[in-house]
Amino acid sequence: MSRSIKKGPFIDDHLMKKTLKAKESKDNRPIKTWSRRSTILPEMIGFTYNVHNGRVFIPVYITENHVGYKLGEFAPTRTFKGHKGSVQKKIGK
């Protein structure tokens, strides 16, 4: 279920403050954040965010196509190593 339109998109206050501060100072350094739940807004276009995936920070450069998505969608938390049997089937053939 999506968020109500009357509530508007969610973004953590501290992340918005960091974004506006970087925009005013024209700072190009990546913005470090743990806020995977924040929605990407048009004000964030052109910035790089280091999004934490639980282990390391993944750099995410925001473009127009990212608007409306969550920051966490671009920093995967799980690594898929493949199914156990599929490797042995390839070797056997």
From Swiss-Prot:
Q: Where is the signal peptide?
A: none
One example GO MF annotation: structural constituent of ribosome
A Pfam entry, by short name: Ribosomal_S19
Q: Which domain of life is it from?
A: Bacteria
Q: Which Cys-Cys disulfides exist here?
A: none
Q: Which GO terms describe its biological process?
A: ribosomal small subunit assembly; translation
Q: Which HAMAP family match?
A: Ribosomal_uS19
User: What family is this protein classified in?
Assistant: Belongs to the universal ribosomal protein uS19 family.
Q: Which PANTHER family does the entry mention?
A: RIBOSOMAL PROTEIN S19P FAMILY MEMBER, SMALL RIBOSOMAL SUBUNIT PROTEIN US19M
* Protein name, as recorded: Small ribosomal subunit protein uS19
Native organism: Helicobacter acinonychis (strain Sheeba)
